[in-house]
Amino acid sequence: MTVEPTPSTGYSNRPYAYALVGVALLIGLAWMNQDRIPPVTIGTVAPDFEVNDLDGGLVRLSDHSGDVVLVNIWATWCLPCLQEMPSMERLYQKIGGDGFEILAVSIDAEAGLFGLDGNVGGDIREFAESLGLTFPILHDPSGEIMRLYRATAVPETFLIGRDGIIYKKVAGGTEWDASQHKELIQRLLAAPQ
C-alpha cells in the first residue's frame, strides 16, 4: 500500500505567525525597557523624534515647534487604523496647515506586513493613496517612536499643543473630526505660541 501525498492548498499561516511574533517582540521590548523610559502622559513634554517620510525625507517633531500636532502611531494591518484614517483626513482638510499638523507614523515593516486585501506585502504608500490621505505619512519600521511614546497598541494618538505639551492621548481608533476633538484642537490653536 502506498500513501499519496496530500496536495497543498497553497495557503500558509506563516505570514500571520511572523506578524504575531513581530508584534509580540515589540511589546516585549517595550515592557523590558519601561523602567528606562520616562512615562509619556497628558501634561508632559512630547518626546522629540526624527524619522523618514515615504519619500526618504527626514521629519522631526521639533520641525513643528509652535504648531498643534497630532502624532498617530498606526499600521496598515490595523483595522481600527483603517477605520479612523478617513476622519483624520477630513480634520486635516478642514484645519490642516493653519498651525495644525498630522504626523501619521507607520510601524509597518519595510514593505508593510499586509495590504488592504489582507495579503502579505502591503504597501504604506498604496494604503495612503487608496484612502486619499494628504497629511504626512512617516515610516518607523523599527518601532522606535512607539517605544519612545510608550504606546502599547495601534492606533495610539497624541495631541500636542503649541507649547510641546501632550494634551490628549487616545489608545484605539476614534472619529478625529468629532466636535470634542475639533473643539480641543481649536482651543490649542488659539493659545499663544
Where are each of the predicted segments found?
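N-terminal targeting signals for export/organelle localization
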Residues: 1-50
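Short loop/turn microsegments at loop-to-beta-strand junctions
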Residues: 46-47, 69, 154-156
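Short active-site neighborhood of thiol/selenol oxidoreductases, capturing the structured segment around
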Residues: 61-82
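Hydrophobic beta-strand core positions in alpha/beta domains
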Residues: 70-72, 104-106, 159
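Structural microenvironment flanking redox-active thiols in thiol-disulfide oxidoreductases
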Residues: 83-131, 141-147, 183
